[in-house]
Amino acid sequence: MRDEAQCVIIGGGAMGTGLLYHLAHEGWTDTLLVEKGELTSGSTWHAAGLIPHFIGSLNMAKVHLDATNLYKALEAETGLSPGWHGCGAVRLAVNAEQAEWYRYVQGVLELIGIESHLIGPDEIRELAPLIEDTSDVVLGFHTLHDGWADPTGTTNAMAAGARQLGATIARHTLVTDVNPLPDGRWEVVTDKGRIVADHVVNAAGHYGPQVGAMVGLDVPIVSMIHQYLITESLPAMAACEHEMPVVRDPRSSCYYRREIDSLLVGPYERADAVTYGTDGIDWDLHFHLTPPDHDVLMPWRELAAERIPVFGEAGIKQTISGPITHTPDGGFLMGPAPGLRNYWMCVGASIGITQGPGAGKYLAQWMVHGQTEVNVREMAPRRFGPWATLGYTIDKSIDEYHEMYQVRMPGEYRPAGRPMRMTPIYDRLDALGAQWQDVWGWERPRYYGEPEDYSWRRSNAHDIVAAECTGVRERVGIADLTAFAKFEVTGTDAAALLGRLSANRLPTRDGGTRLVHMLTDLGGIECEMTVTRLADDRFYLNSAIAGTTHDHDWLVQHVLPGEDVSVADCTDGTAILAVTGPRARDVLTACTDADLSCDAFPWLTAREIHVAGVPVTAMRVSYVGELGWELHHPIDRMPDLYDALVAAGEPHGMVHFGSYAMNAMRIEKAYKAWGGELTTEITPIEAGLDRFVDLDTPGRDFIGRDATLVRRDAAGTDLTGLDMVLVYCEVDATDSDCRGNEPTYDPADDSSEAMGITTGGAWGHTVGKSLAFAYVDPAFREPGSTFEIALFGGRHTATVLAEAAHDPSNERLRA
């Protein structure tokens, strides 16, 4: 066996071979895949092979589409059939909430050209004649061009395609250890010898946690036992002249598909799901199945038999029962592993036949080019942190399995595995009626009041949030913002590091605060942070909590050899309380001797002071666009500071506000957000970040500068050289507002082809308007331009705004 490679992939299932195939097509043919048994011999071989197009995430929909596109073409390329059955699929909606969700999903799929139709019970029975009971069916979501494939055939065909280009595969080769080498490369130790590689990829399926443990990683994956049943041959199936589409049924929590002349039924039981191998899985297992458990399936089998009576009468020819990987949020892990250089993850898919090709495509782009053509935030391993313990992973993964075919409503944060991390004032806020969400393990208030009746339209929280916004805008509000990432960058070369990374100039005076964006080599927006200079060798950085590990790695991994720089993650030890609104100064003055006047403490500055006897870094910034301060302080002193602020705020009518109100008010101010408007496949030119990108200071360079200049020149002064640009708009919505991923249209185009997408929106309670951000054709960039947005099947007019709907001149921030 060879002893060196550019890249070693550990694991020969759908995910590993999907990556091998795409790396080879990207030119990385010096790649070796090692598999301890035969290809597919872990979980891949016993999968049902379903490949759905129905999914509510735009970027995951692109992953799924990549699979169907590839499987249709693989045989012509490789001579091996992937066993593709393009029979389409129908997902049943059995209540109004599901029907609303399906209308939203239809808009998402339309953006990338996936054809779908909403059909009635009669057409459902015509497509799938074995289904007789449709008494509870509101509608069906019919995707015409997906279906299913043979797991072994797809994997072997991708492997053959990679081999044709020069990639290699070593079967029956067990990895026993992985070690970092002093030169930055990796040593992969196997039972057949040692391999040194520039890159290593963990694609080990349900062995992923054990392979990750070799390098000190806790991989948040557990395996769930999944079973499916195959009936004896059915005369009714044999008589069906077409291959019925795959049917997914939320009532029975089952999928149904044809298997020759039999029916294959796969329940995702909604109770008593069983994990597998949480203490480790025997390395010697190959093509392993577990004993069937028909009792746990019986309630769901009975519901399936009500839907399809011939199933209840049929004999069961075979029961397949085996482990399938799951993660706490149901998504796979694809991208750089936290804290490590050139160690990558491509693992954890619960529908790997669907996701292997797309995951491989985008990870190959990431490895070769440094970024991807889609937003991979929801796939990245660093979306989890050390808080994602084994217990948490088990609880959440079981819940995800139980809810596989159920609707996740807007605002719904399921209780499984929670709470994990709470601030010291959790009980105080809970007593006030805080309705919680979990964000990167932290509990954060959404709003304060009665529990939310979840809805795709405006919910009962709408009026409650309106009162919170009014309280902040007219008086003063307090919010727990602890769930943000915080870093200290220190050392004589700290400014040099941050200057190389930041598209904007750094603050030049102690106490200065700037918003900066950090770019990829290709100009994509990698990070967004506020940078506060506390001294010439000491900087304090804040960013979105979801970027904690991502942003820390970005900073640390760009320190040059020999530089005097230290990057400390102080997120867990630092709490943040925000006091904001026109009376914020009055509240704080009652708690501190510091001079808070505008002359002494202007907007976008910070000072280290004491408030109520607590040492704080007070930053005069406000994400809601009002006079205000963020008070960053030791987390163990949070109760003291909070109690003092609440007491001082009582005479001023202080309100507590949560993330719902904050989002509504930031959109009124036209503030863009990382992960929504700002992502790696977008450059500052499309996003309209001109004033935050310094391209003109002589001699100043930063990562992504050259690519940004090229992009700016290609765009032209009228931006017509771009495919799309970000606009801020008012929408004539009635009872619902944009959430993101709604398609946008040119009203003069009769083709009904979507031209762009929204990234988020909200009702502006202060201005009385429904507001949104959207990427559209540059022809619609000018203020006053109108286009259309699809909301739940209806078209709504959007009008481009020239400036923020609330306080565009920032007078309130500067007060």
What are the residue ranges of the model-derived segments?
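Flavin-dependent oxidoreductases
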Residues: G18, D177-T290, P299-V310, T389-Y413, ...
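Glycine-rich FAD pyrophosphate-binding loop
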Residues: A24-W45
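Central beta-strand plus flanking loop segment that forms part of the substrate or channel wall
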Residues: A48-H53, A89-R91, L217-H242, P299, ...
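Dinucleotide-binding Rossmann-like beta1-alpha1 core, especially the glycine-rich loop
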Residues: G49-L127, R251-Y256, I260-G266, I398-P410, ...
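Flavin (FAD/FMN) cofactor-binding and adjacent substrate-gating region
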Residues: A73, H85, V94-R171, T176-G184, ...
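C-terminal catalytic lobe of FAD-dependent flavoproteins
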Residues: R251, I260, G280-G417
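Acidic, proline/glycine-enriched N-terminal capping motif
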Residues: P381-L519, G524-E526
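Conserved, structured C-terminal
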Residues: M409-Q437, R444-R446, E450, R457-N460, ...
